[in-house]
A protein has these predicted regions:
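Flexible "arm" and connector segments at domain edges
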Residues: 1-64, 68-113
Length: 113
């Protein structure tokens, strides 16, 4: 499946639960989806808290799937073509200078985003 097919499958699931209905107890707003995305990402972090190695790969896979589903939904309801955004970001990152002198080599020398 590609990103568009995964997004469609996610929307079908959400529709089947009635979560897009105006009276839903789980309003699927960009704000709520961003919060849920962050919470699920934090659940993925729990798999590494106080331990050096991953103990349950299947559980982590499940959390990563949750993160991905919320990401797909947030992008979609916000009108963002995630595939194009990813390609653009990869292009931006390829032309960026990265700080390799410090302990934090993930830091950029310049540029935003």
């Amino acid at each position: 499946m590609d990103i568009k097919e995964l997004t469609e499958a996610m929307h079908n699931f959400v529709h089947s639960k009635g979560w897009y209905e105006p009276d839903s107890k789980r309003p699927q707003t960009p704000r709520n989806l961003a919060i849920s995305l962050s919470l699920e990402a934090n659940e993925a972090l729990e798999h590494f808290q106080w331990q050096g190695e991953l103990k349950d790969k299947d559980e982590l896979a499940s959390e990563l799937a949750d993160v991905t589903l919320y990401l797909l939904q947030l992008a979609s309801v916000s009108g963002i073509d995630l595939e194009q955004a990813i390609l653009k970001k990869l292009e931006t990152n390829a032309s960026r200078e990265w700080n390799t002198e410090s302990d934090d080599s993930s830091r950029r020398v310049s540029g935003k985003g």
